[in-house]
Structures are given as structure tokens and as C-alpha cells.
Amino acid sequence: MSEPKEPSPALACAAQDGSGLPEGWLQVQSMDLDAQGVARRADGKVVFIDGALPSEWVSASTYRKKNHWEQANLTAIHRESAQRVRPGCPHFGLHAGACGGCKMQHLHMGGQVAVKQRVLEDNLWHLGRVKPAMVLRPIEGPAWGYRYRARLSVRHVIKKGVVLVGFHERKSRYVADMAQCPVLPPHAAALLMPLRSLIAALDAHDSCPQIELACGDSVTALVLRHLQPLSVGDHARLRAFAAEHGVQWWLQPRGPDTVQPLDEGGEQLSYALPDFGITMPFKPTDFTQVNPHINRVLVARALRLLAVRPDERVIDWFCGLGNFTLPLATQARAVLGVEGNAALVARARANHGLNQALAQNHRVLAATDFVACNLFAMTPGMLLGHGAADKWLVDPPREGALALVKALADIEQSRRGAQGATALPAGAEDWVPPRRIVYVSCNPATLARDAALLVHLAGYQCAAAGMVNMFPHTAHVESIAVFERG
């Protein structure tokens, strides 16, 4: 790639609106969710350029053409963005074999946050016709060493005579040849090369496709997916590795429900929410947030925005292990956690019991219950069955909370007597919708869809929204939004 060149003053003036650039040059206007620079040709066709940043003037080579858009590889930068920085990892880039785990290391962190905030606001407006009354300050944290969970692929490359352990190559099914990873905690990143040697030494080295990493505050667990039984010798090698590197091994011979520790009796994985005096034990395959620092800030921010009073009842939808439920129980009169996975419900109850037992007199947890319910099949009748609550906390997976918010909207439409509204069970007219909803999202598109239902059909206003930089250097957008009754 050529070195950036300073344009002449005349060229700079001519190109302020993207016109007048030399033939073949493109002015990058923005960045999309796949971290591609977005430009337009003179005929209006959109060009998505790998590796290009907003405000840059570039040349690019097209590798995919459609009627209204193209995808292209960056070939030269003629004017470089002031926010272009040197990547922090030698495995990041556009070169062959580059790791695909990160997409934005070449963009200054302030630029990454700005791109994600714009993506959030654009999705809310263009997909949902929703404009927040206030944009929240972004939640930010460490740029490196933040990723406490990772799914590492394993591949025995026979032609090279090596075992690779890491993320997939950029736009490829192959495993990147990576010796380090600065987004992992240092103690976890230091395991990459020893893991390669370990897997190569196993009798089952050809049948171990994946290692899942899960770090707690003081324990690191590794889940080995193996497609054939491990030999006695393999068990011994795993134990020796665990002793040398201070990790726990868990084995997964089939599906997720088959995961078991190699040896019983080890210290339990857990993380703390110190602002609330909460300790959260978890299993390595349980869903927990990738970034523990951001999670602590996010929980505190969500509860401040919800502003729960001691006389209020709160429902935490998609509650998981109780990441929000238990902190809510330090503030509310009563809390209900609703989760689709019955096993998680059982562990959430156990976590509540543990923290209740550890609670000091000034921090006894509120009356708290957990129930299992398929939240993707929610109906107005089911929603009414959970009872009224003053406030809701909603933290769905990427699919969003469509059935839940649609049930709420259907109830509101029926109460208003809207034409074609769903008929509700007797007594529904006495049900009171929540005054405030705090919605934590990991997908801005489904957030926008659900926000549209809440605002346009359920009688809410979007009081605030902002991005949460849970995944620095990646294109993933976490966000938080507040909805209040109009």
C-alpha cells in the first residue's frame, strides 16, 4: 500500500463534497457495522472498502459487484485519517492469514466509539423512526486485555505439521496462525502457544476442534471439545498442563449439556459486582458478559437509569444467572427474574440463596423469585400472568424481545380500544404497564425494531439511549436505552 500523500490546496477544495477527485479515487464518508469504509462513485454506486476509514481519500480494487453496490479492497491511501493508528496486534490487518477476531484496531478508540454511537442512532431512526430525547455518555473501559470469554478454534495442519489454536482468519474458515492476542487477559493470552504444544501431544490431537476460555475473577477454565474419547495418557497430559498453568479443564464430548470438569473439587468460577456486594458463581458454558469491567459499569448505569425505589416491584426479563436481578434485589421491594433456560433459573436461585446468606443486615436482598418461561413465545395472557411491575429491565440476546414488547403493545392497544386489537382476558383492564423500561441490547437492529413497538404502539417515549463499548476493536455494538410512559 502506498504512503499517504498531502493533497494540494486546490484538490482539497475540489474534494470537500467528494467531487473533483482524480479518476479512481474515492472519498470515504462513513464506516458500516462490518468496519468497512463507505464511499460513493460518481454515478452514485456505493462502495464498501475493507480497511478504509471515514474522511480518507483512497484507491480500491473491486472484488464483488452488484447493481447498486460493490465491495473492494483498499489499495492506496492518498489522504490518511487523523484517527488512523498503528494496530496493537501483529496478527491484525488485511494481509493473507490475518486474524479475524478484531476489525477496528486501525481506528483510534474515540473513532470506534463514535462509529458505534452513529450506528445505534441510525438504526433507531431509520429502522424504528425513534429518536432518543437524550444521548447517553458512552460506557468505556480498557481497550486491551478485556476479553474474559473466547471460543478458540483448533486445527491440526498436517501439511505444516503444526496445531493452530486461535480465532479464524479474516473472512475464512481457516484458523489464524497467532502467537499472541492482546484483547485477551495477559494470563490467558500466554496460554496460546502452550496449548498448541499440548494439543499436538494428545493422542486425540485430530479430534479436538475447539477450546472455550472462561475467566472468572480468580479462576480460569478451559473447555475442551473432543470428538472421540480421551485416553488415560491424554487425561494425564491435561492434568499436568492444568498444574503448570493454573487452569481448570472441563471436557465436552458432545453437546453443551455434556460439559463436566475433568476433576471435581476445584474452586468455582465467579465474578463480583462490588458496588452491590454481589458474588456471581457460574459455569464455563453459562452466558456471562465478555468484558467484566464494562459489565460492572453497565449494571450500575442500568440501575441508576431505572431509579428503583424501595416500595417498587421490578421484573428482569431474560435474567440469566441474575446479573441484574440480584443488584435490583438490593434496592426494590420485590424482584422477579424471568429466563427461558430452566438450568439457568436453577442457578440464579442458587446465586440468590448464596448472596442472601452472605448479606449483611444492611443489605438483605428483597423478596426475589425466578421462573422459567419461553420469552420468544410470550402472549398478552402470559404477560398478564406475571403480574404488574413498576419497572422492567430487559436484556435479551441478539434476537431481541419482539414477543415480549409485542405482548405489551397488544395490551395497550386493546386498552385504548384500537381497531383490530387483540381481545384480552377478563381483568386485564386493571393491569398497569411499567412506568419505565431499561433495555440492554447487543443488536442495534432488533433494539430499533422493539423500540418502534414501544414508542409507536405501546405508549412509551425513548427518554435516552447510548452505546456501551463492551467489545473494543470489534464491530459489535452493545447499547442501553430508556423508555418511559408518555
Swiss-Prot record:
It comes from the Bacteria. This is 23S rRNA (uracil(1939)-C(5))-methyltransferase RlmD. S-adenosyl-L-methionine binds at Q289, F318, N323, E339, N374, D395. GO terms for biological process: rRNA base methylation. It comes from Verminephrobacter eiseniae (strain EF01-2). The active site is at C442 (nucleophile). [4Fe-4S] cluster binds at C89, C99, C102, C181. Belongs to the class I-like SAM-binding methyltransferase superfamily. RNA M5U methyltransferase family. RlmD subfamily. Residues 14-76 form the TRAM domain. Keywords: 4Fe-4S, Iron, Iron-sulfur, Metal-binding, Methyltransferase, rRNA processing, S-adenosyl-L-methionine, Transferase. GO terms for molecular function: 4 iron, 4 sulfur cluster binding; iron ion binding; RNA binding; rRNA (uridine-C5-)-methyltransferase activity. Its EC number is 2.1.1.190. The keyword S-adenosyl-L-methionine applies. It catalyses: uridine(1939) in 23S rRNA + S-adenosyl-L-methionine = 5-methyluridine(1939) in 23S rRNA + S-adenosyl-L-homocysteine + H(+). It is an enzyme of class 2 (transferase). Catalyzes the formation of 5-methyl-uridine at position 1939 (m5U1939) in 23S rRNA. The keyword rRNA processing applies. Pfam families: tRNA_U5-meth_tr (PF05958).
